[in-house]
UniProtKB/Swiss-Prot annotation:
This is UPF0412 protein YaaI. Residues 1-23 form the signal peptide. Coiled coil: none annotated. It holds the Pfam family DUF2541. Belongs to the UPF0412 family. NCBIfam families: PRK10154.1 (NF007541). It comes from Escherichia coli O6:K15:H31 (strain 536 / UPEC). It comes from the Bacteria. Keywords: Signal. InterPro entries: UPF0412_YaaI.
Length: 134
């Protein structure tokens, strides 16, 4: 009887952990160090091509100013999309979700995300964290 209760409790805990993991599909895609001078070639290359439907940007360390962002998809035509992003992100702030794959082609996967911008109000380099949701 004791082993039946132990097995039942183990299964219940496993199911709770399983459902919790599936409910949150957010993944940190990467972190970029933002230089102090305006730079337009900051790239986050994803080693494994991922289907990503939307992203969030977060300033983990320092304030940063962004002047543009593009997302590139693994495709024969090297398809890309320009993203509508906020111009400033303060330290500790996270943006709303930014939708990508807007043409409803959910089969395309993201291979690279590029940014233009720089650190502001700091002598240290700010860090930009990119979070993806599939």
């Amino acid at each position: 009887m004791k082993s039946v209760i132990t097995i039942s409790a183990s299964l219940a805990i496993s199911l709770m952990l399983c459902c919790t993991a599936q409910a949150n599909d957010h993944k940190i895609l990467g972190v970029i160090a933002m230089p102090r001078n305006e730079t337009n070639d900051l790239a986050l290359k994803l080693p494994v091509c991922r289907i990503v439907k939307r992203i969030q940007l977060s300033a983990d360390h320092g304030d940063l100013q962004l002047s543009g962002a593009s997302i590139y998809f693994k495709a024969t035509r090297s398809a890309s999309q320009t993203l509508n992003i906020p111009s400033e992100i303060k330290e500790g702030q996270t943006t709303d979700w930014i939708n990508i794959n807007s043409d409803n082609d959910n089969k395309r996967c993201v291979s690279k995300i590029t940014f233009s911008g720089h650190t502001v109000n700091s002598s240290d380099m700010a860090t930009l964290k990119i979070i993806g949701d599939d």
